[in-house]
């Protein structure tokens, strides 16, 4: 975001601050605020790609805040971003007035148990993945959903995704796309050693537990596309809906189907050329 655009965003009558390290890049004369204070904001503006927006959303969760999140595309894809930088001036009035609709999205909370003790915890906006990792032999998992056993899994990994995450890694692995407003937790296998192990859509409030029976040296728990913890045989990973709901501001004129088509090429016809067309 350029400094002139930033000045438009803050406008008059807005008590505005920026995260540490951002002020110098913008050349803006506004207070800096520590990341852990993000929950004090009414609206948190995240400018960047999906990774940036997810990181900001996790900070809101960690702060226990109900801040609204305004995602502004500044990366390569920005599927989670409702707005493009250049169109912000058109909607600043509605943003300041608080008249934009809010899209509530559930997130995930996970914890890693090792030797019966809690070894690590975290939260995810899109997904939690138990990945086989190097040297790329299959990972073996035994799972439970709400305390009931599900078939043992053997393969490259297992994705536990939110509805928002259904358009990310889960979609690339053949999982279903879930529209906003339909909250769900989705299990999507990665290269399962069984043709019958298919994606499974669960209620958002379902709790999933995965016991690691076999792991590789590089087996990992991946949170929103980033390494969170290494896994080893005997570990147990519990994933449940986060007690907080994320509140994203919605674009008033861009339905979900249009976003899918524009950013993911959803339902696009195959490319072809007529004989004689230029190469």
Where do the PLM segments sit?
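ATP/NTP phosphate-donor binding region
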Residues: 1-47, 54-62, 85-103, 112-122
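A generic structural signal for short beta-strands and their flanking turns/coil linkers
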Residues: 104-108, 124-126, 137-141, 156-158, ...
């Amino acid at each position: 975001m350029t400094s002139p655009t930033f000045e438009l965003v803050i406008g008059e009558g807005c008590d505005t601050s920026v995260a540490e390290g951002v002020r110098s890049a913008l050349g803006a004369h506004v207070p800096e605020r520590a990341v852990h204070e993000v929950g004090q904001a009414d609206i948190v503006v995240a400018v960047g790609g999906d990774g940036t927006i997810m990181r900001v959303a996790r900070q809101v969760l960690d702060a226990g805040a109900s801040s609204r999140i305004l995602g502004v595309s500044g990366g390569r894809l920005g599927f989670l971003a409702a707005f493009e930088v250049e169109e912000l001036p058109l909607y600043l009035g509605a943003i300041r007035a608080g008249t934009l609709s809010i899209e509530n999205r559930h997130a995930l909370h996970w914890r890693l148990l090792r030797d019966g003790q809690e070894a690590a915890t975290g939260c995810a906006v899109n997904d939690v993945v138990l990945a086989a990792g190097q040297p790329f032999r299959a990972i073996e998992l035994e799972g439970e959903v709400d305390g009931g056993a599900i078939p043992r899994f053997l393969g490259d990994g297992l994705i536990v995704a939110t509805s928002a995450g259904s358009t990310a890694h889960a979609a690339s692995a053949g999982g279903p796309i879930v529209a906003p407003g339909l909250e769900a937790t989705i299990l999507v296998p990665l290269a399962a050693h069984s043709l019958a192990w298919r994606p499974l859509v669960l209620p958002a409030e379902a709790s999933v537990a995965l016991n690691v029976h076999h792991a590789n040296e590089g087996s990992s728990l991946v949170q929103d596309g980033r390494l969170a913890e290494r896994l080893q045989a005997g570990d147990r990973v519990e994933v449940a809906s986060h007690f907080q709901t994320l509140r994203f501001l919605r674009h008033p004129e861009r339905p979900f189907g249009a976003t899918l088509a524009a950013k993911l090429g959803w339902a696009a016809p195959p490319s072809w050329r007529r004989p004689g067309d230029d190469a």
